[in-house]
Amino acid sequence: MAKHLFTSESVSEGHPDKIADQISDAVLDAILEQDPKARVACETYVKTGMVMVGGEVTTSAWVDIEEITRETVREIGYVHSDMGFDANSCAVLNTIGKQSPDINQGVDKADPKEQGAGDQGIMFGYATNETEILMPAPITYSHRLVQKQAEVRKSGKLDFLRPDAKSQVTFQYDQGKIVGIDAVVLSTQHCDSVTTPDLREAVMEEIIKPVLPSEWITKDTNFFINPTGRFVIGGPMGDCGLTGRKIIVDTYGGAARHGGGAFSGKDPSKVDRSAAYAARYVAKNIVAAGMADRCEIQLSYAIGVADPTSIMVETFGTEKVSHDIIIEAVRQFFDLRPYGLQEILNLLQPIYKQTAAYGHFGREEFPWEATDKAELLRDFAGIK
């Protein structure tokens, strides 16, 4: 592809689907804090005045689902009834049951190293050297815009903003390299008192300009700030929210393939989550080692079976060493069994609530973002 455009979108922590994701992961974290070996599959539904938390959990822990839910909604910023959703007064329904013993017998083994996958499925991981965090630029800057929206809202700098927001950034590429930004969309919920011109000016000056690199902005860049002109009704009052509905926002913004499995609310025995994190870890280390400019990893699993049923490595013609060397390096240096994923990436810890908004990848605080295998891979491949 010579010249082309590519677009990704993100949503804020106050988007209904992201409220649901954060509640599911807050419940997961609270359980893992007491019982790291718990089996958790937690789903959340939110709508005006109501949160329903359901799923399957097997654990020795006890957690206060209602209080976790209210505190999560409170932290996001829905604390007044005039927003259509209030952490202090919304109904919280709990319909959590136990995990099926039929699933359990396939996962739990006498030898922990032979722990089986919690389900069948396919997972993808991706990395590219087009940004310093080895992530695609469109999703990276889409996340940063809505993160900035939350920052200026919570600090009171733009006190007329409300929690719900969406962003979208279109990048221009030439021969695979970024040459500019073609379009920026940012829609943010707001209180009724602010005028559209004032809001648009404030968003441009306090959110967009501080986030997007000026060298990529030209006179031809299009900006669409609250293009409908009004966004007062938002959050769960505007749309219902469900866990697991923002899987492309959570990953690579469409720049890589997706196996279809969502992440939030799932403990690390669920390979939908842990293997997707591991695939990112592998792809990122391959790119960090200089073995390729872009790398996509596919993994697949069978329920109750420890070893992956397949491993695929795609480098899109950007590899700097033989494809066979890359595949051998993956097999030799990465333990991709469920137990191996949990141990290498230290996944049995309560770190998941913070993943549930602004993307699971490209954030250095998470263990799957480490490039600690890069030097080993360079030596193996003979890269100087």
Curated annotation (Swiss-Prot):
<dbReference type="InterPro" id="IPR022630">
    <property type="entry name" value="S-AdoMet_synt_C"/>
</dbReference>
<feature type="region of interest" description="Flexible loop">
    <location>
        <begin position="99"/>
        <end position="109"/>
    </location>
</feature>
<dbReference type="InterPro" id="IPR022628">
    <property type="entry name" value="S-AdoMet_synt_N"/>
</dbReference>
<feature type="binding site">
    <location>
        <position position="239"/>
    </location>
    <ligand>
        <name>L-methionine</name>
    </ligand>
</feature>
<keyword id="KW-0630">Potassium</keyword>
<comment type="function">
    <text>Catalyzes the formation of S-adenosylmethionine (AdoMet) from methionine and ATP. The overall synthetic reaction is composed of two sequential steps, AdoMet formation and the subsequent tripolyphosphate hydrolysis which occurs prior to release of AdoMet from the enzyme.</text>
</comment>
<feature type="binding site" description="in other chain">
    <location>
        <begin position="230"/>
        <end position="231"/>
    </location>
    <ligand>
        <name>ATP</name>
    </ligand>
</feature>
<keyword id="KW-0460">Magnesium</keyword>
<dbReference type="GO" id="GO:0006730">
    <property type="term" value="P:one-carbon metabolic process"/>
</dbReference>
<dbReference type="GO" id="GO:0005524">
    <property type="term" value="F:ATP binding"/>
</dbReference>
<feature type="binding site">
    <location>
        <position position="17"/>
    </location>
    <ligand>
        <name>Mg(2+)</name>
    </ligand>
</feature>
<feature type="binding site">
    <location>
        <position position="239"/>
    </location>
    <ligand>
        <name>ATP</name>
    </ligand>
</feature>
<protein>
    <recommendedName>
        <fullName>S-adenosylmethionine synthase</fullName>
        <ecNumber>2.5.1.6</ecNumber>
    </recommendedName>
</protein>
<feature type="binding site" description="in other chain">
    <location>
        <position position="99"/>
    </location>
    <ligand>
        <name>L-methionine</name>
    </ligand>
</feature>
<dbReference type="InterPro" id="IPR022631">
    <property type="entry name" value="ADOMET_SYNTHASE_CS"/>
</dbReference>
<feature type="binding site" description="in other chain">
    <location>
        <position position="56"/>
    </location>
    <ligand>
        <name>L-methionine</name>
    </ligand>
</feature>
<comment type="subunit">
    <text>Homotetramer; dimer of dimers.</text>
</comment>
<dbReference type="Pfam" id="PF02773">
    <property type="entry name" value="S-AdoMet_synt_C"/>
</dbReference>
<feature type="binding site" description="in other chain">
    <location>
        <position position="15"/>
    </location>
    <ligand>
        <name>ATP</name>
    </ligand>
</feature>
<dbReference type="InterPro" id="IPR002133">
    <property type="entry name" value="S-AdoMet_synthetase"/>
</dbReference>
<feature type="binding site">
    <location>
        <position position="262"/>
    </location>
    <ligand>
        <name>ATP</name>
    </ligand>
</feature>
<dbReference type="InterPro" id="IPR022636">
    <property type="entry name" value="S-AdoMet_synthetase_sfam"/>
</dbReference>
<feature type="binding site" description="in other chain">
    <location>
        <begin position="245"/>
        <end position="246"/>
    </location>
    <ligand>
        <name>ATP</name>
    </ligand>
</feature>
<keyword id="KW-0963">Cytoplasm</keyword>
<keyword id="KW-0067">ATP-binding</keyword>
<keyword id="KW-0547">Nucleotide-binding</keyword>
<feature type="binding site" description="in other chain">
    <location>
        <begin position="164"/>
        <end position="166"/>
    </location>
    <ligand>
        <name>ATP</name>
    </ligand>
</feature>
<keyword id="KW-0808">Transferase</keyword>
<dbReference type="GO" id="GO:0006556">
    <property type="term" value="P:S-adenosylmethionine biosynthetic process"/>
</dbReference>
<feature type="binding site" description="in other chain">
    <location>
        <position position="270"/>
    </location>
    <ligand>
        <name>L-methionine</name>
    </ligand>
</feature>
<comment type="similarity">
    <text>Belongs to the AdoMet synthase family.</text>
</comment>
<dbReference type="InterPro" id="IPR022629">
    <property type="entry name" value="S-AdoMet_synt_central"/>
</dbReference>
<dbReference type="Pfam" id="PF00438">
    <property type="entry name" value="S-AdoMet_synt_N"/>
</dbReference>
<keyword id="KW-0479">Metal-binding</keyword>
<dbReference type="Pfam" id="PF02772">
    <property type="entry name" value="S-AdoMet_synt_M"/>
</dbReference>
<dbReference type="GO" id="GO:0004478">
    <property type="term" value="F:methionine adenosyltransferase activity"/>
</dbReference>
<keyword id="KW-0554">One-carbon metabolism</keyword>
<feature type="binding site">
    <location>
        <position position="266"/>
    </location>
    <ligand>
        <name>ATP</name>
    </ligand>
</feature>
<dbReference type="GO" id="GO:0000287">
    <property type="term" value="F:magnesium ion binding"/>
</dbReference>
<dbReference type="GO" id="GO:0005737">
    <property type="term" value="C:cytoplasm"/>
</dbReference>
<comment type="pathway">
    <text>Amino-acid biosynthesis; S-adenosyl-L-methionine biosynthesis; S-adenosyl-L-methionine from L-methionine: step 1/1.</text>
</comment>
<feature type="binding site">
    <location>
        <position position="43"/>
    </location>
    <ligand>
        <name>K(+)</name>
    </ligand>
</feature>
